[in-house]
Amino acid sequence: MLSENEIKILSYLKLKKKANAEEISKELGLPLSSIFSLAKLLEEKGYVKIGERKIIRFELTEEGKKRLKEGFPEEILLKELNGQPSLIEDLKNKMGKDLEIAISWARKKNLVKIDQNRVIPNTSNYTFSTEKEALLKPESADEKVLQELLSRKLITRKEESKLEITLLKEEFEEQNYITQLTSELLRSKDWKKYKIREYNVEALPPYFPLAKKHFFRDFIEKLKDVMKELGFTEVNAGYIEMELYNFDLLFQAQDHPAREIHDSFRVDGLGKIDDERLLKEIKEMHEKGWKYSWDPQIAKRLVLRSQTTAVTARILSSRPSVPFKGFSLGKVFRPDSIDATHLIEFHQLDGVIIQKEFSFTDLLGILREIFYKIGIKEIKFKPGYFPFTEPSVEVYGKIEGLGWVEMSGAGLLRPEILKAMDIDANAGAWGIGIDRLAMLLFGLKDIRLLYANDIDFLRKMKVRL
């Protein structure tokens, strides 16, 4: 059974025998996409054969148009020489930057020779008619001339594929079909002139993809849900932070390499610190622990936070009620070369537990529970070092196909830090690189794909937590 539009296509092909899809679309006034699908249906029914014909087109570039109008550089050079030798310096004053190109091509064509600082013509009657004809009609140009024009970027070559439809059966039933009976058709009895189209009750409806969140944003939201389910309170702070919270309060010395300009983004201006007691305690902590003269002006410098542990530092400085369980998940910034595994802007999750009897064993237990809920069932711990925790631990998770991969750094906060914050309790803290974790869980080879906007790619990505 043929549809009305299928009959239109066959009727047109009956006259032409063969036509491309664009031509049929234009003549029948049907969308090109409809011609493609209808041709496929007709091919399945044996009425037509679909083929592909490659068409090569050449187009003049802006430089090509210029040369057609003004002449080739070597052509202009010959005109300037007018059959007589000339100094390169004199020619350069007249032709400018085109002289180098002109000499290069003129020598290739044996039109000139160079003798010391002079250009000497070998001919004065060379015509450029072949090259100009090739610019006007590249399709019929000599292959050697064509390649020259292409290499000089005077023309571009474009290859197009045309869908060509050939009629196989000239006999077909030119019967009009209707899809529904109307009261007018019944009254006038005109329905007898038509065939009623059959319905395929087994046909599936068209697929309409539903809207959904970007998979990485969804992943971050689900991580937050995991932390909240475990009783943690989300705490946020700004991206611009004083070095006091980003470094000093975390017992990182003021001469530490991480504080250099190449490891953190500096921001103009200075912050303000009103808590004199806090400054005094931090000064004592640094000068006693690191044996140097601590400078409060350095602590006031502003940076784009390089770790969300800066939020943990702010939590501690606010002297929260004990017990306290908090976390922060947000962007951090570090100078780096962007590639498949590095970005200058990425996400971290930091957590802190402040509790009277909180132990190192308790910390390992909560880390194990967090990673289990994320979907990493097997983890192991190795001793580590971080300036603001002691003891410290590195957390490794087992990822299918990759083996053991580092996931997090953690530890109990140093007594000096807790004393400076006037906190009479133990505290455990940890940090997780979220972008790297997402790469591993989603099986991505390129960290930049976490921020992809390719719709087909995004539709395939699913978050399973």
From Swiss-Prot:
Quote the subcellular location field of this record. Cytoplasm
Q: Which residues bind Mg(2+)?
A: 390
Reaction catalyzed: tRNA(Phe) + L-phenylalanine + ATP = L-phenylalanyl-tRNA(Phe) + AMP + diphosphate + H(+)
Needed cofactors:
Mg(2+)
What domain of life does the native source organism fall in? Archaea
Transmembrane region positions? Answer: none
Q: Which family does it belong to?
A: Belongs to the class-II aminoacyl-tRNA synthetase family. Phe-tRNA synthetase alpha subunit type 2 subfamily.
User: What's the protein name?
Assistant: Phenylalanine--tRNA ligase alpha subunit
Question: What gene codes for this chain?
Answer: pheS
